[in-house]
Swiss-Prot record:
It catalyses: Hydrolysis of terminal, non-reducing beta-D-glucosyl residues with release of beta-D-glucose. Belongs to the glycosyl hydrolase 1 family. GO terms for molecular function: beta-D-fucosidase activity; beta-galactosidase activity; beta-glucosidase activity. It holds the Pfam family Glyco_hydro_1. It comes from Oryza sativa subsp. japonica (Rice). This is Beta-glucosidase 5.
Length: 513
């Protein structure tokens, strides 16, 4: 049972992107609406480093990684050293012709004690970044929370497992709105509540590393995998609603800004046309996507979740339902790949999220059934992004959609990343198709601008448009082929790539096979 659950969970969280996506550009920047923005993204813990500098307190991820729980016992103590190199990166953003940049704020850097006194040096750091972006005409998108919580709040009341976090998160957001809102009009409250809660409170694979036997991927000392993922998401949704209400009442009129949330998505194809596999595909989206979005649009969880999870799924009071309902100005989605889904009988006895969803995942239709080894690679499927966008539009009406993360991860950190160029070309092309079909998509962000510490693999996977040499303490950047292509595309032309460089990229790709 535990082995099967581990395989299913790994299939969900450890599918790392490899392989080229055949694509021809066939479009230019000018084919997209003028108000559509193209950008790139990083996050505070994964990018900044400076973990104990200028008043920053430890986050849950500092504690987690310092316990040696990541591959190679890696940490983000320095990461890409964005705390010291942001000015250089701003220049690279200008060189890349970025139209927008999505960053997250470190709560531990802004309010080291989780509540109360604000750290002026933390404010100065983010003000300097924001000022630099605005000065160069780059639109600023801020994520308030991207998995890194002040450890003091974990110690005091178990973080997202306690309703006490609602007031602390609201107070933290209030500081950010007040200090940065005059220059920032695009806000995202929380990143990926769905996947974050599964990894943090079911498998124990993400900080704070809570789980219970027999469900954890790693050995956990505390946690309850059967209930904690649902409690954490419930509190995240209530916190989102509270912060949205604050923003709308106190700041939105003056700033004319918008606020939303980010949800992890993948397109799910039924493995067969059988009734049970078709139902499994729908159940997959109910548990993964609608778990977060349905309450924020319609005020309650999907009925299938209530039926299967039962009393382990928290319920909204009437007042809470009214608060969460309609608390989105836009939908933010992170999207990387598609999966094939088939039905798995609902287990008896104690269950966790993975058992509740009762689904098997495969990277392709020809993959063998899940066994002792989970698939670790999957080919790109740009059509899946288009289908996901259109599906969200059909489900939730004309809410604007921002694709806040999309990118290509590789264990080969070469600068000759032709596979990544092909991936980006094909996925951006799928967005254009969705737009022409009437989808209300407003922006697209490549993950990531520079190589960063990845939450699942540490430094084992590279996603950056710019390569970072993590073996060099100065963390030098080097433009990849993908950075040059993206820059050319944003200049409304296709980049001229030296044929010898393409040949080198092809040779490296063959050597990796």
């Amino acid at each position: 049972m535990a082995a099967a659950i581990a395989v299913v969970y790994l299939s969900l969280l450890l599918l790392l992107l490899h392989g080229a996506a055949p694509a021809v550009l066939g479009y230019t920047r000018g084919d997209f609406p003028e108000d559509f923005v193209f950008g790139s993204a990083t996050s505070s813990y994964q990018y900044e480093g400076g973990f104990d500098e200028d008043g920053r307190s430890p986050s849950n991820w500092d504690i987690f990684t310092h316990q040696g729980k990541m591959p190679g016992r890696s940490t983000a103590d320095v990461a890409a050293d964005g705390y010291h190199k942001y000015k250089d990166d701003l220049k690279l953003m200008v060189d890349t012709n970025l139209e927008a940049y999505r960053l997250s704020i470190s709560w531990s850097r802004i309010i080291p004690n989780g509540r109360g006194d604000v750290n002026p040096k933390g404010l100065q750091y983010y003000n300097d970044i924001i000022d630099g972006l605005v000065k160069n005409g780059i639109q600023v998108h801020i994520m308030l929370y991207q998995l890194d919580l002040p450890q003091v709040l974990e110690d005091e009341y178990d973080g997202w497992l306690s309703p006490r976090i609602l007031e602390d998160f609201k107070a933290y957001a209030d500081v950010c709105f007040k200090e940065f809102g005059d220059r920032v009009a695009h806000w995202i409250t929380i990143d990926e509540p769905n996947v974050a809660s599964i990894g943090s409170y079911d498998s124990g694979q993400l900080a704070p590393g809570r789980c219970s036997d027999p469900f954890g991927i790693r050995k956990c000392t505390v946690g309850n995998s059967s209930v904690e993922p649902y409690i954490a998401v419930h509190n995240m949704l209530l916190a989102h609603a509270s912060v949205t209400k604050l923003y709308r009442e106190k700041y939105q009129v003056a700033g004319k800004g918008i606020i939303g949330i980010s949800v992890y998505t993948f397109w799910a194809y039924p493995l067969t046309n059988s009734t049970v596999d078709l139902e499994a595909t729908k159940r997959c989206q109910d548990f993964i996507v609608h778990w977060v979005l349905r309450p924020l649009v319609f005020g309650d969880y999907p009925q299938v979740m209530k039926n299967i999870v039962g009393s382990r799924l928290p319920s909204f009071t009437k007042a809470q339902s009214e608060d969460v309902k309609g608390s989105l100005d836009f939908i933010g989605m992170n999207h990387y790949y598609s999966l094939y889904v088939n039905d798995r009988p609902l287990g008896k006895g104690t269950r966790d999220f993975v058992a509740d969803i009762s689904i098997y995942y495969r990277g392709s239709k020809t993959d063998p059934p899940p066994g002792k080894a989970a698939p670790t690679s999957i080919g790109p499927d740009p059509q899946g992004l288009r289908l996901m966008v259109q599906y969200l539009q059909e489900t939730y009406g004309n809410l604007p959609i921002y694709i806040l993360e999309n990118g290509y991860g590789s264990s080969n950190d070469t600068v000759h990343d032709n596979d990544r160029v092909d991936y980006l070309k094909s996925y951006i092309g799928s967005i254009l198709t969705a737009l022409r079909n009437g989808a209300n998509v407003k922006g697209y962000f490549v993950w990531s601008f520079v190589d960063v510490f990845e939450y699942l693999t540490g430094y084992g996977q590279s996603y950056g448009l710019y390569r970072v040499d993590f073996a060099d303490e100065s963390r030098p950047r080097q433009a990849r082929l993908s950075a040059r292509w993206y820059s050319g595309f944003l200049k409304n032309r296709e980049m001229d790539v030296d044929q010898s460089e393409l040949a080198m990229a092809a040779a490296e790709s063959r050597a990796q096979q």
